[in-house]
Amino acid sequence: MNQRSARSVLSRSGVVLVDKPSGPTSHDMVAKLRRIMGTRRIGHSGTLDPMATGLLVVGVERGTKFLAHVVTHDKRYEATVRLGVATHTDDAQGDVLSTASPQDLQALTEQQVREAFAAQRGDIMQRPTSVSSIKIDGKRAHELVREGHDVVLPERPVTIFSLEVLDVVVDDATSCIDARISVHCSSGTYIRAIARDVGEALGVGGHLTQLRRTSVGPFDVSEARTLEQLEEDPSLTLNLDEAMVRCFDTREISESEGVDLSLGKWLKPVGNKGVRAAVTPSGQAIALVEEKGKRASSVFVARPAGMD
């Protein structure tokens, strides 16, 4: 790659915040964005189910490599859980496994429903939904389920920082209970699993009927654009400098230290903890660096030598 084309790639590198509609898969969204943005180097920081809407954080060009360091950020969701019906996918698109009787549902109080959701808060062990993208012996769990296999994934630790029940409404036609919730959780949490587990705890079954992701780390859906808006203006939401500084605390470096990082060299530690965005006086975010022992080494170089 010559220097001119390298600079062109860097100028096109960054993050696009997209408001995903219900229907397409995250893979479908990437395919559409490749056409809109005019590059195949497109990737996202976390899958949204087809039925889900909301924030999809998309990396463009070198932004795809940057997003690998953002996937562990916490997330926020708004969702509707239907209590009274369990499905094999834990959402409305799955086959019905069980339906609670009207008598059992009418016996539940709103206080019991709220307490069952409250029990999900904090550091918990959660069993991922069987139709997740988690791989088992090289194959994704949802593919195995579609092939007819009985998939039960092991529990793993997640953190529910907050879970608020916004309202509880009874569907008069079915006696099912719809609970609208707001969740702030760690990466790797399955909201469908919360619906399933609350339904099981109440003895009536439960599944997800609506899901909207409202934030990923420092990125909020209020900044996101629809595919139609991006068709009209296929521009970055944040360039690479802006994205790195938003996601990470910074370490101020000299221009010469910036050159060293661009060449793959390490810097002297200054007592920082965690990953930092190394930023020059001119405002360029050169790399993400992390101190270990007597070195501050780069974990991602945004501007390799020749891309300045």
UniProtKB/Swiss-Prot annotation:
Record GO biological process: mRNA pseudouridine synthesis; tRNA pseudouridine synthesis
InterPro entries in alphabetical order: Dyskerin-like, PsdUridine_synth_cat_dom_sf, PsdUridine_synth_N, PUA-like_sf, PUA_sf, tRNA_psdUridine_synth_fam2_C, tRNA_psdUridine_synth_TruB, TruB_C
Key words of the record: Isomerase, tRNA processing
EC number: 5.4.99.25
Domain of life: Bacteria
Alphabetized CDD domains for the sequence: PseudoU_synth_EcTruB
Protein name: tRNA pseudouridine synthase B
Biological role stated in the UniProt entry: Responsible for synthesis of pseudouridine from uracil-55 in the psi GC loop of transfer RNAs.
Family to which this protein belongs: Belongs to the pseudouridine synthase TruB family. Type 1 subfamily.
Catalytic residues identified in the record: D49 (nucleophile)
Reaction equations catalysed: uridine(55) in tRNA = pseudouridine(55) in tRNA
One GO MF term: RNA binding
Major enzyme class: isomerase
One Pfam family matching this protein: TruB_C
